[in-house]
A protein has these predicted regions:
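N-terminal leader segment of winged-helix/HTH proteins
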Residues: 1-26
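Short helix-coil-helix linker/hinge
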Residues: 29-31
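Pre-recognition alpha-helix immediately N-terminal to the DNA-recognition helix
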Residues: 34-39
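Short capping segments at the starts of secondary-structure elements
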Residues: 43-48
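A short acidic, leucine-rich amphipathic alpha-helix
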Residues: 51-57
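Short coil turns linking two alpha-helices in DNA-binding domains
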Residues: 64-65
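Basic amphipathic alpha-helical segments that dock to polyanions
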Residues: 68-78
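Non-DNA-binding regulatory cores of transcription-related proteins
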Residues: 77-103
Length: 103
């Protein structure tokens, strides 16, 4: 069962927008990439890569922490997330719903 199948309508629209944008940029869409995108969209707080990794690991046991970081890097480069540097040297991530298409 895929994580994003439980998104509410607003989150589903945002999810589809992100995935479509990545496809248009010829960025490979993997199940773990979709899971990270859905996680960020659904998150009410600002998760760290480690938090995302630990929460998704039970459903994606072959996923590595590096995979999460790589996916966050792509989402950051494409303008879908922002990095938030915390005082304790932790970096957390926040979704950007107002993403504009930049081609």
């Amino acid at each position: 069962m895929e994580l994003h199948s439980h998104l509410n309508a607003e989150h589903q629209t945002a999810f589809e927008h992100v995935i479509q944008h990545l496809k248009e940029k010829r960025i490979r869409i993997t199940e773990t990439r979709k899971a990270v995108v859905a996680y960020i969209i659904e998150s009410d707080d600002h998760p760290s890569a480690e938090m995302i990794y630990l929460d998704l690991l039970p459903n994606y046991p072959n996923m590595s922490l590096a995979t999460v970081y790589n996916n966050l890097k792509v989402l950051l480069e494409e303008g879908f997330v922002t990095e938030l540097k915390r005082a304790n040297d932790t970096t957390t991530y926040d979704e950007v719903m107002e993403h504009e298409h930049h081609n």
